Amino acid sequence: MKWLPATAVFAAVLPALTAFGDPASVEISTSHTGSGDPTSDAALTGFTQSSTETDGTTYTIVGDITFSTFTNIPVPVVTPDANDSSSNSSKGGSSSSGATSLIRSSNLHSDFDFTKDSVLDLYHLFFPSASNTLNPALLSSSSSGGSSSSSSSSSSGSASAVVAADPKGGAAFYSNEANGTLTFTTDSGNPGSLTLQNLKMTGDGAAIYSKGPLVFTGLKNLTFTGNESQKSGGAAYTEGALTTQAIVEAVTFTGNTSAGQGGAIYVKEATLFNALDSLKFEKNTSGQAGGGIYTESTLTISNITKSIEFISNKASVPAPAPEPTSPAPSSLINSTTIDTSTLQTRAASATPAVAPVAAVTPTPISTQETAGNGGAIYAKQGISISTFKDLTFKSNSASVDATLTVDSSTIGESGGAIFAADSIQIQQCTGTTLFSGNTANKSGGGIYAVGQVTLEDIANLKMTNNTCKGEGGAIYTKKALTINNGAILTTFSGNTSTDNGGAIFAVGGITLSDLVEVRFSKNKTGNYSAPITKAASNTAPVVSSSTTAASPAVPAAAAAPVTNAAKGGALYSTEGLTVSGITSILSFENNECQNQGGGAYVTKTFQCSDSHRLQFTSNKAADEGGGLYCGDDVTLTNLTGKTLFQENSSEKHGGGLSLASGKSLTMTSLESFCLNANTAKENGGGANVPENIVLTFTYTPTPNEPAPVQQPVYGEALVTGNTATKSGGGIYTKNAAFSNLSSVTFDQNTSSENGGALLTQKAADKTDCSFTYITNVNITNNTATGNGGGIAGGKAHFDRIDNLTVQSNQAKKGGGVYLEDALILEKVITGSVSQNTATESGGGIYAKDIQLQALPGSFTITDNKVETSLTTSTNLYGGGIYSSGAVTLTNISGTFGITGNSVINTATSQDADIQGGGIYATTSLSINQCNTPILFSNNSAATKKTSTTKQIAGGAIFSAAVTIENNSQPIIFLNNSAKSEATTAATAGNKDSCGGAIAANSVTLTNNPEITFKGNYAETGGAIGCIDLTNGSPPRKVSIADNGSVLFQDNSALNRGGAIYGETIDISRTGATFIGNSSKHDGSAICCSTALTLAPNSQLIFENNKVTETTATTKASINNLGAAIYGNNETSDITISLSAENGSIFFKNNLCTATNKYCSIAGNVKFTAIEASAGKAISFYDAVNVSTKETNAQELKLNEKATSTGTILFSGELHENKSYIPQKVTFAHGNLILGKNAELSVVSFTQSPGTTITMGPGSVLSNHSKEAGGIAINNVIIDFSEIVPTKDNATVAPPTLKLVSRTNADSKDKIDITGTVTLLDPNGNLYQNSYLGEDRDITLFNIDNSASGAVTATNVTLQGNLGAKKGYLGTWNLDPNSSGSKIILKWTFDKYLRWPYIPRDNHFYINSIWGAQNSLVTVKQGILGNMLNNARFEDPAFNNFWASAIGSFLRKEVSRNSDSFTYHGRGYTAAVDAKPRQEFILGAAFSQVFGHAESEYHLDNYKHKGSGHSTQASLYAGNIFYFPAIRSRPILFQGVATYGYMQHDTTTYYPSIEEKNMANWDSIAWLFDLRFSVDLKEPQPHSTARLTFYTEAEYTRIRQEKFTELDYDPRSFSACSYGNLAIPTGFSVDGALAWREIILYNKVSAAYLPVILRNNPKATYEVLSTKEKGNVVNVLPTRNAARAEVSSQIYLGSYWTLYGTYTIDASMNTLVQMANGGIRFVF
């Protein structure tokens, strides 16, 4: 503001001018300058402007007026320096020798009035050398007013201070009228300036003294500089109000000094600076309070156009001067009436130079008015600074000399820049408000307020480098602090305090609201030069000493040590902290404290809401809460940006933040919550939250907004790189709950105890760690020296997580997760627990009970490990999962895999149990109701030792009980292993590893569709191994029941049980396959020690299993036989029950590779049942070679049940099969087959009536050497096909019945043949053997009677294939004279009869080409008619998808060259095309046609039916072009190329001979079609009709592959091919009809269809039986035909079209009909 209108000036000063009548008016147009010498200045009569008007005086300043260089301070008396006798005097002006001692008093004001004489008397009493005469202008009839201070001046050296007898101020202007207002104004048209400088007075107000109000208005400049008062008000003093307003340019107070209050001004009532251009207080000094301004009332500064500056002002209480020994009191002084403080002060100043001086103990300071408060401003009431541009408080200080004691009852505690005994309000700043470099002796380095502090509407607030020796380096308030509505920046930087609150201390609450950018940086609290005595972490919050009751001062020497209370490096609140509406950032950075709360300390609740970027970074605390400490709950709501705690550190708990015991952190709707790189020397590297930490998002729709279909998620949590020396590297809490978030990440956190990322605490029946409804949860790269590399807690629940990753964490137990109680994982769409490491148990997860349920997506537990190099016997469990209770996998619907996990001891010397490479479950593991494949792959339990006395077990799973049941998708165990470095089976005292995939006390696999064990390895039980974990109860049992199929493939064992090892094994109602398994010793598929039951409900196959060693050494050397199943019991037989009641059982190619022996079952075995029901079989293609521990042979009934009418097969057709079953066998039901070269040895064999025994060539049925026993058979089927010699091979091997040699003959050794012998011709060609062209003796049985037993063949009846309708005919009879070594059949030849001749036609095989060609043309017609022909090329360039149904019918009537032939087909076409340009179309189609053909009877003896199914792929295109000379008529080109693959099958029936032929063959076909058309008549505006001429070339080529008939007298046909080129030429007419929004587009065409090129397909055939050959020629259609076509399209709006075409081709004897219909969609 340069100039103000006159009306504005008048309005501003009107209240002061009209308060008490009309004041006197004085114009001042002359400057005044004194000499600076008190004697000379006393003689000046016109210098001081005195007002005696009761209504005051108005001074009009004309021009630039200056009052300068005036003093009434006596020249001090200089005495010789005691240390320098040569010094006689001291020269120079007046100066202070030290601050006056202040007396403890509540009232320093005196009502005693001096008369002139009394003043002179008192003056001469203390100054005997002074003149007897004083200038009246320097004397007052009364004391100088209400100053509560006394002062002195002094000189340097040994000069004594001199004080005037009557202190007086007002060197320039003086008014003693209480109601008289001194007003300073000017001419508004030519404003003047007033400068008061270098005025030094003994009384109050060196330049101006007024008992009434004081008003400055309308001046150009107002300047007070270099003025000094030995009392209060270094420049001006008023006991009324001070009003300074409408100053055009500047108001300046610089270098003013007072020994009392108000270094520049002292105001008893309200102080107002208003409507100024600028206001400046600089280098003003007060000896008591208010270095710049002191007011007993309020201070208001408002409407400052430019700047407000308070720079280098001081309120400094000096050390007292030594108190001299007083002389005897003068009779002139009445001690009862003179102000005590005045006398003491003056006496101290006026002591004669020769008087001795005695040191005095400093007097305590007892009032806030004298305690050095307010380095720039002191106000006993409120302060308001508002509506300004810039405000600066810089380098102001409030101090008390260190030798002085501030009474503990004193309210005042400094305020380096501002002190207010009430509230402070600074508001409406458009520029910058700066508090910088201010210092306070105690609290409030910048601001000290007894009341509330409000900083509002400040564009830039900067509080930097303020310091105090108490609390609140920048701000101290005994009530609340509010900072709100900041437009740009609020910053607290570099502030320090020694106690609490490096920047801010508030006894009340702190509110930060509606600010843009708030930063607290590099603030510090604490005494860093003294040792730290930390308070205990659980002590009550420190409260300011000023809030406690007053107590007597305690001498410093006697004071007890004080616990360091330096809390809150930047901020301290004894109530709460409330933050809201921060739009850019609230940052606490690089702050530090020596106790709790390196960034902030909040005693009660901390609430932050609706803000952006709350951040605590790089703060330090010597106790808890490196970033934040809160004594109550913390609530964060609706925060955007990163809510960040980063690189903070604490010496105790909570590197980032810490809360008091029992308190919680609740966060709702945060965009990002980050704990990063914080450290704590105890718990909670990132955060220590003793009760609950909750982070969630709550979505509330607006009133008009519909509820969301799916609850939205929002926000993230990032806990990364934090470190705790104890537990909870990221977070330490009792309960943690995260929900409704987009992501939660715990990464690279470290703890030296438990919970590398997160530690929660177990609570009874309560989940203490939960993650619910979150998109991504990542727990990665965390480390704990103790347990829980990622998470440690009691009970955890992960629910409705889209993506869960637990990866690369490390710990002693629970590398990823460690829980003392349960873990529940459910509804996790995608999950991964991978690459985690533990040194004892639970590489991925460690918990008591674990439930993985309702997982709809992909979930993997992969590459986790428990790995260590053991030096002590510490058991290692659970590479992927460890459970001290039960593990349950249920209702999993996505893909699930436990892969690549391991538990391993890398040491080679120390033994330990190593179990559960994938999962270790102490009590049970259950996998049930899963409808996704479950994969266990490449898991391992291993030791580097070559032998071990401990148990290595369970490469994938280890548990007492494993149950896998009621799943609907495959369960797969692939390449898992339990192993040591052993190369041979364990010796006595050592243990084999067990269970490459599963090791358990009991295993139950039931009601699953498919289970696969492939490539697993262990030393026993390559896939499944049973271990006694319960001392035999329940028994070690494997139960596999009610499954669809179970596959054991390529599993291996070093010892036995390549697939399964157990005591009791039951495979029932399950299809199972054991293929390619191996072991070193017998039992390559199954090794069983008690009982084995095999009762499948579909096929049970043992195939290609291998034993690799020749012998196995236990107590004795045992030869390996290559047994797939081995009974491993050295004391008794194991029992085996084979039941094929619902599915067949096969043993095939099970081999001992070292000896090339094949064996299905071996060991000490007793068969309790071998049962096969009707249609089922038990097939032994490998030998059964069992032994027994029983003394007497046991009974065995084959097919004992009446329903067991199936087949039991022993076959030697693949390799030698000598089966030994040392039991007494009764064959009760069904069919027993001894296949080619198979041998069965039993103790005895008895065939029950109604059964059949089929014996193949070379088969042997023998008794056994264990006991004597006979063979009794009564219904035998003999495969005769290979026991009748041929002309080329006379050597044959009939079946053999054998009695083994015995030392002592026994009558039980006998052979008895009765009943029926059925001769079987399985290939139907026995009677084509020319060997039967004469009488022959054919051996029916060879008899090997080494036991010399009885052999009888009585009542034997022959049946079966005893003759044929064709071939060699004769009769068979049993030779009654057969010798003891053979049973002979005699053949008597009768005649030879040929096949009956049936004439057969062949052309219908070739006629199928017609059906193939017709399917190609039908598809082509659909493409042309539906898309290429009807979709006009002037249409817009849209894309189309279309689909149509196809139908065709071909009928060939009988003619002289062929029989009738019909073909009908149906199918579909699906196509998509595009128009890159309007005139060009390109598309592709896929078609399938399912056709059937039929020929009628011929010669009444055969009928032919067939089918031809085609699959076709087509490309089609169309384009418009013009002939070069004719541009008026476009030519439309259309082309189709189709490839087809056809499959044909036929059946020809010959009823007369009850025979048939069947044939199957393939054809490959191509079609190429090119059409050109031109419009002869185009549509007109009045007609949509169009006439078009078109011609096309249609070429088809079909190649039929060769094939051979089956069944009756088969023929072999060669391949052939057919090509056909037709040139359809014709006309078409089309037009459109419209009805409402529907357009109907119709078209009719007719064409002549000549065939101009074709070939006649020919094939050759050969009759296989007679080698007769011939040719087959196709009957060709006629060359000329006609084609008619009708099509229609219905346009249903812009996108959908219905269409259809019907085409008919007619020629002589042939009619072909083709139809297409479908729908088209434009996109």
Curated annotation (Swiss-Prot):
Stretches with biased composition (Low complexity): 85-100, 140-161
PANTHER family from the UniProt entry: WD REPEAT-CONTAINING PROTEIN 48
Region feature Disordered, mapped onto this chain: 78-100, 139-161
Family recorded in the similarity comment: Belongs to the PMP outer membrane protein family.
GO aspect biological process, one term: double-strand break repair via homologous recombination
UniProt keyword Signal, yes or no: yes
Protein name: Probable outer membrane protein pmp20
Domain Autotransporter: 1434-1723
Organism, scientific name: Chlamydia pneumoniae (Chlamydophila pneumoniae)
SMART domains: Autotransporter, PbH1
Topology of this chain in the membrane: Peripheral membrane protein
Keywords: Cell outer membrane, Cell wall, Membrane, Secreted, Signal, Transmembrane, Transmembrane beta strand
Pfam family, one: Autotransporter
Signal peptide annotation: 1-21
Subcellular locations according to the entry: Secreted, Cell wall; Cell outer membrane
GO terms for MF: ubiquitin binding
A cellular component annotation (GO) from this entry: extracellular region
Domain of life: Bacteria
